[in-house]
Amino acid sequence: MDATPGQYDFAPAAPLFPLPNIVLFPRAVVALHIFESRYQAMMAHALAHDSLIAMALLLPGWEKDYYGHPPIDPVVCVGAILNHEHLPDGRYNLLLQGRVRAHVVGERAGHPFRIAQLTPAPESIPEESDLANERTHLREIFRHGQWRNTEIARHLDKCLGGTISTPDAADLIAFNLLDDIPLKQSLLAEPDVRRRIQRIIAAVTEIHLPTPRRSNWPPKTSSN
C-alpha cells in the first residue's frame, strides 16, 4: 500500500487512460489489464518515455463516444508504472502507483490514444503537526468499532503508525475503502487538504460493514 515517499518532477504532459470506475489517488497502487490496441500503444509510449500515465474519470454520457473522445473530469491523478508484464498477444498487466494530482488543460493530437497537457492541481496543505487531531481520529477508526480486527484495518493502522504524512494516508484510505466513484473524484479534486481529510473521515465513519466483512485486500485487477 505504501511505497517509499519521494518528491517528483511534475510532468507537463502524460498519456490519458480514462475509465468509468476508477479514481486513482497519490500513493495508491492499482492493478490494470490493458487489452485495447490504442491502450497497448499508450503503454508502449509510456514505457519508452517516463513511464507515466494520467488516470482520468469518464463523465456521464461517455458510452456514446467511448472509441472517440469521450468527456473526462479535468482533475486527474498522474501515476508511475511500478512494474508490468507484456503478454505474447500484445496485452499488458501492470501496477500503476499514483504520484500527483493534476489538471488537464489541453490535449495533444497525433496518437491513437489521448495525451493530456497538465498543470499541477493547487492544494492548501497544513503543517503535519496541525493535523494531529485528524490523524488520531483516523487511527481510532481502525482500532475501535466495526473496523477493529479487519485485515485492511491492520494494514491502515500500521500505515498511520509510520512516517507517512496524514494527507497521503487519507488518500490511501479513500482509495481503498470508499466505493462511491463521484465522491472519490470530488475528494481527488478537493484543494483544501484539511477539509479533504475531514470528508474522508466522515465518509469512512458512515460505512456500515456486513458481519463478517469479506476482505477486499489486496484489490482486484481492473481492465480497460
PLM features: residue spans?
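N-terminal low-complexity, acidic/polar interaction/targeting segments
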Residues: 1-224
